[in-house]
């Protein structure tokens, strides 16, 4: 098989990233201290990121940076500053949730490759077209999809020059990524801001079935589903786990690397998955991939199940087990973990992410060119001015001036450590422009002979007036029994359509056709036939206006020329998100996210003729 399958690994800190690299990851994804959906991970500084990129590239491994949270209005300046820094790194892509960030990157930082985060809940073909339109080159498909759905969506993605990722190992959430508000509502920590409190792992009152953790799903594992994922032409197999340590990352990535290599080389799978059970797990399920959604997907233990698994395997072999044997099994598991950990530490011990030191030596002699010699552990080169130095009594170059002009180097992976002025004579003149040109050329060479991209100032968005002088009333109904309200008010009445149409949507087509003032309200999740039926509603009713929480339906409405409004579950939280929807897909208005407060909403600037 000639097609490359990317193994994409998590990196919550520098050690975990090193572990992923030596274990055979083709790419790693990691976050900085801000703007990423794993605040509980250690994360990286910008200097560490640059060192990680250099190290990863030496091993043929790519680095993707997670900027996968929604952004608040006051954060525009901070994210713009960061993007200005990122364009002068060699980062291979950024992983994005915020719709406004797509707009900023597409307009002002087009050299950055943008990947759509799992937080964008991508599960139907319209959403892939939507994301391609706003600038995504890769999408992460929702974990809830089955294999035929993944295959179909990957085909659609490839038709639009978009790559697909699928999570193949790690934690599963009880809700769709990007559509879980339990943490936000219960304790005020939004998962869309990287602060999920994991309510699905909490203990609740014991259920009738005797479970204390009724929302706790087993971990995802597609270890034996590799042939089907290859057949689906998925581009990237993604491992979850940026909160996990280096030992976990190394073990999982190493196990998956061997599985992929075995299948690519021989067409055969490795049957032994025991190492996956030796690191943190909640037992495993592939129920979503198989489309087999049952109670067996759940486990009444949110903590590490590796010890329970080892004891169960020993019990199966012997039909019974004693306390002494349990202790022996425990010791064996700890020893196995130690072996894997020591193997990992031996491999990463000498991996270095520190910046390469640079020493500058200057030479200034009358009648000769001004010379700068650049020395690094990996390369040395010398540059000269075009003009010859002249003796003068005034305006001569000085050590102080040279130190100021050469106070640093504009390179993400180099640091200036020393200046040597011992060969610089006093009382000599050289045009300052030539000194600046030499500095720029040094930066160019140290930057891999790539021009340093200049700082971009993102202009403030204009403030357009409200469409209506005063706020208007509207209401949302979800039941036929509430249709009488339609006759007693002049307010806009939205009719909430279900996530699942069970068989067909004829019932809802009849309701909407009989009540033309009703405005269809589409849900956030529409998979497979439910998406097809939702599209059929648009095609048969051709409503004048809709509200949609699903970007796939938004794209279809845009194609059909139907006026559409973004629902609150599209998670719009800033002005640039509204600009994206208006400029790219002719959106007419938006319900701002329910997760931000009145003070945060007040500063959002609407596009022209755009209703909030």
Q: What kind of region is each of these model predictions?
A:
Residues 1-22, 27-34, 38, 53, ...:
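Surface-exposed amphipathic alpha-helical tracts and adjacent flexible/coil segments at the periphery
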Residues 123:
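Active-site PLP-lysine loop of aminotransferase-like
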Residues 44-49:
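Glycine-rich, highly charged phosphate/nucleotide-binding loops
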């Amino acid at each position: 098989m000639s097609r490359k399958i990317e193994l994409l690994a998590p990196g919550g800190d520098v050690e975990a990233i090193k572990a992923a690299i030596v274990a055979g990851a083709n790419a790693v994804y990691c976050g900085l201290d801000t703007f990423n959906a794993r605040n509980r991970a250690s994360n990286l500084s910008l200097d560490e990121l640059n060192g990680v990129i250099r190290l990863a590239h030496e091993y043929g491994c790519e680095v993707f940076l997670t900027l996968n949270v929604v952004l608040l209005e006051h954060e525009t300046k901070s994210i713009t500053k960061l993007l200005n820094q990122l364009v002068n790194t060699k980062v291979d892509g950024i992983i994005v949730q915020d719709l406004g960030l797509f707009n900023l990157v597409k307009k002002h930082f087009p050299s950055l490759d943008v990947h759509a985060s799992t937080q964008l809940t991508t599960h139907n073909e319209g959403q892939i077209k939507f994301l391609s339109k706003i600038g995504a080159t890769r999408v992460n498909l929702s974990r809830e999809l089955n294999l035929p759905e993944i295959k179909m969506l990957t085909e659609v993605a490839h038709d639009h020059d978009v790559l697909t990722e699928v999570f193949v190992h790690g934690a599963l959430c009880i809700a769709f990524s990007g559509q879980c508000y339990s943490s936000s509502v219960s304790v005020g920590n939004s998962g869309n801001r990287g602060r999920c409190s994991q309510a699905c792992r909490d203990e609740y009152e014991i259920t009738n079935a005797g479970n204390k953790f009724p929302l706790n799903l087993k971990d995802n594992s597609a270890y034996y589903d590799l042939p089907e994922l290859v057949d689906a032409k998925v581009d990237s197999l993604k491992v979850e786990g940026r909160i996990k340590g280096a030992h976990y990352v190394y073990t999982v990535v190493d196990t998956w690397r061997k599985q992929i290599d075995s299948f690519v080389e021989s067409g055969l799978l490795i049957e032994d998955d025991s190492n996956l059970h030796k690191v943190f797990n909640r037992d495993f399920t592939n129920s979503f991939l198989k489309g087999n959604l049952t109670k067996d997907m759940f486990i009444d233990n949110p903590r590490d199940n590796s010890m329970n698994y080892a004891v169960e395997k020993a019990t199966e072999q012997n039909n019974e087990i004693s306390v002494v044997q349990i202790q022996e099994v425990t010791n064996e598991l700890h020893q196995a973990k130690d072996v894997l950990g020591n193997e990992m530490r031996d491999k990463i011990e000498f991996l270095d992410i520190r910046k390469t030191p640079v020493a500058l030596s200057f030479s200034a002699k009358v009648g000769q060119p001004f010379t700068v010699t650049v020395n690094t552990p990996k390369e040395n080169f010398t540059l000269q001015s075009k003009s010859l130095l002249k003796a003068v009594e005034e305006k001569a170059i000085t050590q102080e001036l040279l130190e100021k002009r050469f106070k640093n180097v504009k390179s993400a992976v180099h640091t200036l450590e020393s200046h040597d002025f011992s060969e610089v004579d006093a009382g000599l003149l050289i045009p300052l422009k030539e000194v600046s040109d030499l500095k720029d050329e040094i930066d160019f060479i140290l930057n891999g002979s790539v021009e340093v991209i200049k700082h971009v100032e993102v202009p403030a968005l204009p403030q357009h007036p409200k469409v209506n002088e005063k706020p208007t009333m509207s209401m949302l109904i979800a039941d036929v029994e509430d249709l009488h309200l339609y006759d007693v008010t002049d307010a806009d009445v939205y009719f909430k359509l279900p996530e699942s149409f069970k068989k067909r949507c004829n019932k809802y087509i009849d309701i909407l056709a009989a009540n033309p003032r009703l405005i269809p309200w589409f849900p956030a999740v529409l998979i497979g036939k439910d998406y097809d039926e939702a599209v059929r509603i648009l095609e048969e009713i051709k409503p004048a206006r809709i509200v949609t929480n699903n970007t796939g339906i938004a794209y279809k409405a845009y194609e059909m020329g139907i006026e559409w409004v973004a629902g609150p579950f599209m998670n719009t939280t800033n002005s640039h998100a509204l600009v994206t929807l208006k400029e790219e897909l002719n959106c007419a208005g938006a319900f701002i996210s329910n997760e931000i407060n009145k003070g945060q909403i007040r500063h959002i600037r609407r596009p022209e003729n755009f209703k909030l």
